[in-house]
A protein has these predicted regions:
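Catalytic cores of DNA base-excision repair glycosylases
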Residues: 4, 13-200, 206-209, 215
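Intrinsically disordered, low-complexity, charged terminal extensions of DNA damage-control enzymes
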Residues: 1-21, 25, 29, 188-328
Length: 328
């Protein structure tokens, strides 16, 4: 009964306050499943506000799973340009190809079949199962984790481990008839009300029983992430006012994308950096060196900095080009 009360409170709040998001539009069941697949890939490590224009452009150009499975790689990367984490879009296309070939163009409903697809782990499989197929599953994303931590007042390191939170989320119960809405409602509650800072408790449907609200302590215990310090020498080759870029087969980040030739250095002494970037869990310190002659014989491109919009380039590379141009 208590679970049902919580569920109804959250669903009632959601019906009134939910955001209008393009992947929530009323469409056929087949389109809803495709929209969910695409949006969940895009939302991995990326905020909703950032994803919306990319999603709209993506769906306009690639309206179904079959077209995605055959879409030109260069055009696909261009559609994704600026979202980062490009392995997501490569995995999304691989997933589409498997769905077309193995599952007769139908996104699989089974959780473990979903998990077998490239780029889909526990969370994404849970989200697709709940949202696209109305299964009574609560996908534990950052928003729902935050609601759970505050509602139960979880303050110990042992209490914020994934395994513990997965067990504790049962406090929210499930909705048999509206599982899709309920999963999204919990996410929405974390995104709009139980925000990382300055939660809007006065509008929260759970505040009466929330232990963080009762204790007036909304601080969140987090695992400390340590960014790895890395050092690189970036080599600049210039000819006819164009920069030489190479296809990256050397580093795990920005795989198969165009970057400047770079060498990683191990704990260099007296390293005088020109630039600093953060990619994933790396703090990249970069020293720029201008070179005259190169010995690259393939996978190179000469880029005109005045026409950057014409190229498929990661933001990382674009920022370096703009920096170099600003130093003239």
């Amino acid at each position: 009964m208590k679970d049902l009360i919580i569920t109804n409170k959250i669903l009632n709040w959601y019906d009134i306050n939910k955001r209008s998001l393009p992947w929530r539009n009323k469409v056929s069941q087949e389109k809803k499943q495709y929209f969910t697949l695409v949006s969940e890939f895009m939302l991995q490590q990326t905020q909703v506000a950032t994803v919306i224009p990319y999603f709209n452009r993506f769906i306009k150009n690639i309206p179904n799973i079959e077209k995605l499975s055959k879409y030109n790689d260069r055009k696909l990367t261009k559609l994704w340009e600026g979202l980062g984490y490009y392995s997501r879009v490569r995995n999304l296309k691989k997933t589409a190809q498997i769905i077309v070939k193995k599952f007769n163009k139908k996104i699989p409903r089974d959780f473990y079949e979903l998990k077998s697809l490239p780029g889909i782990g526990d969370y994404t499989a849970s989200a697709i199962s709940a949202i696209a197929f109305n299964k009574p599953i609560i996908p534990l994303d950052g928003n729902i984790e935050r609601v759970l931590k505050r509602y139960l007042y979880l303050k110990k390191q042992s209490q914020i481990k994934k395994e513990f939170l997965q067990d504790q989320k049962k406090i929210f119960g499930t909705s048999t008839k509206r599982s899709s809405d309920y999963a999204q409602a919990l996410m929405e509650l974390g995104a709009l009300i139980c925000k990382p800072t300055n939660p809007n408790c006065n509008k929260c449907p759970l505040s009466n029983n929330c232990k963080a609200f009762k204790n007036k302590n909304f601080d969140l215990v987090k695992f400390k992430k340590i960014n790895k310090e890395t050092y690189y020498k970036l080599n600049v080759y210039k000819k006819n006012n164009q920069y030489l870029l190479i296809k990256n087969n050397k580093f795990n980040f920005l795989k198969n994308l165009n970057i400047f030739p770079m060498d990683q250095l191990n704990n260099p002494k007296n390293f005088d950096k020109d630039l600093n970037f953060k990619i994933s869990n790396m703090n990249m310190n970069i020293k720029i060196e201008y070179k005259k002659n190169h010995n690259f014989d393939k996978n190179i491109n000469w880029i005109n900095p005045a026409k950057l919009e014409n190229y498929v380039l990661p933001t990382f590379t674009k920022k370096i080009i703009k920096f170099l141009e600003s130093q003239k």
